[in-house]
């Protein structure tokens, strides 16, 4: 199961995901929504967990920023930082995620564990 949790506005998030990942079926695509606190508040992750009925222990939260690592920690899920995003590796390391990867193939390996 794949889902998106973004701090971009909801309409922009949906548009970007549809454009860049047209062949991937996401269970949920959430951006900023009225009345919902933005990350690192864990509400968006909790909303996804409610929809998917997946336990926190089975989640790998993949992100490219310290805010993402904080969100994962706040939600009680496993964090995986990716080094090809907008923030430097050092920012990810500050939050001590369970994993930091340098390429997408490594995510599949971690998810299979």
Regions found by a protein language model. Give the residues of each.
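Conserved phosphate-coupling serine/threonine residues in phosphotransfer and NTP-handling enzymes
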Residues: 6-8
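Asp-based, Mg2+/Mn2+-dependent phosphohydrolase catalytic module
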Residues: 10, 14-113
């Amino acid at each position: 199961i794949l889902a998106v949790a973004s701090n971009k506005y909801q309409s922009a998030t949906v548009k970007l995901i549809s454009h860049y990942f047209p062949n991937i079926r996401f269970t949920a695509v959430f951006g900023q929504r009225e009345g919902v606190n933005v990350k690192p508040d864990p509400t968006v992750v909790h909303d996804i967990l409610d929809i998917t009925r997946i336990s926190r222990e089975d989640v790998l939260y993949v992100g490219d920023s310290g805010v993402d690592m904080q969100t994962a920690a706040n939600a009680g899920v496993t964090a995986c930082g990716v080094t090809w995003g907008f923030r430097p590796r050092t920012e990810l390391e500050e939050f001590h995620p369970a994993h930091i990867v340098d390429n997408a193939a490594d995510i599949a390996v971690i998810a299979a564990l």
